[in-house]
Amino acid sequence: MKISYYAPSLKRPQKSITQKLYPFVKLVVKESEANEYLKNGNEIIIVPDMAQGNVSRIRNYILDNLYDNSEAIFIIDDDCNGVYVYQKQKRIKLNSDELLEFIESNTILCKEWGYYHWGINCVPDKGAYREHTPFGTLQYIGSPFGVHIKNDIRYDEELPLKEDYDYTLQHIKKYNGCLRINYANYEVKQSEQVGGCSTYRNLKEEKLQFEKLQNKWGSKIITIDKSSKKTYDFNPIIKIPLKGI
C-alpha cells in the first residue's frame, strides 16, 4: 500500500525533532518560511501561505492536495519525541523502519475493518493499554498521529483547538467507527513550544472552542471532565451513543 508521510510545521524552522527520528516524514511549510527551514536541513514540501493559519486548514490542504497517488496519508506533529509500543510489559520506542512497518500493517487492518481513519493512544500510561482490548473503534484519536485512507471527511476549520475530537466523531458518524491502536502511543510537547497551534491557544479560546464543539454535537456527547483537578480541563470527554469498544 502506498502511503505519503507529512508533518505540518509553522514557525519552527529548527531541525524537526520528528524528522531526526523518522526521516521519511516530510515537513509541510508555507512558502514565506521555506528558506529558514531549508537552511536547517529540513526536507520540506512548500505550500502557499494561505494553506496555513490554523491546524485544521493545513491538514485539509494536505488531504485535498498531497495524496500524490497514495491510498493513504500519514500526518504527524513536527515535534514528536517518539512513537512507543508496549512489548512484554515494557515501553519501547519504534525506530524508523519499525514505524514504517507499523503504519503500513495497521493501515491495511483499518481498511479491512471498513474504517478510513486510525491512530494511537494519546497517553503513555500502561493502564491505557488495556491488554484484553488492544484495539478500539469508538475512541478519540488525537491529531498528533493519524492515518487517513482516502475519503471526503475534512477537519472543521472553525474548531482549530478541538479539531481532532470533531474529526473522530465525523468518522464514527459516517463509518460507525475508526481504529485506535491502544498498545501504542505518541509523545509530543503539545502547547509547550513556540509555533504551531500554541500561537493562538489560551484559556479563553479553549473555552470558546469547547462551547462550539458541544453546540455542534450536543451535551450528551460532549461533556466536561468533572473529575479533573484543574479549574478548567482543556480536554472534553466524548460519549459515543453506540455499542462497541
Descriptions of predicted regions:
Residues A72-D77, Y116-N121, C178-N182, I222-D225:
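A structural signal for short, well-ordered beta-strand segments and their strand-loop junctions
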Residues S4-V25, V29-K39:
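Short, well-formed alpha-helical segments that are part of the catalytic scaffolds
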Residues S16-T18, Y37-L38, Y84-Q87, A128-T133, ...:
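A short acidic (Asp/Glu
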Residues M1, P23, N42, N69-A72, ...:
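Short coil/turn segments at beta-strand junctions that form active-site/ligand-binding loops
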Residues M1-S4, K11-P13, L159-L161, Y165-I245:
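C-terminal catalytic/acceptor-binding lobe
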Residues L10-R12, D79-N81, V123-K126, D152, ...:
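Short, solvent-exposed loop/turn segments at secondary-structure junctions
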Residues V29-I76, N81-N95:
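Active-site-proximal specificity loops/subdomain of glycosyltransferases
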Residues V83-D166:
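Conserved catalytic core of nucleotide-sugar-dependent glycosyltransferases
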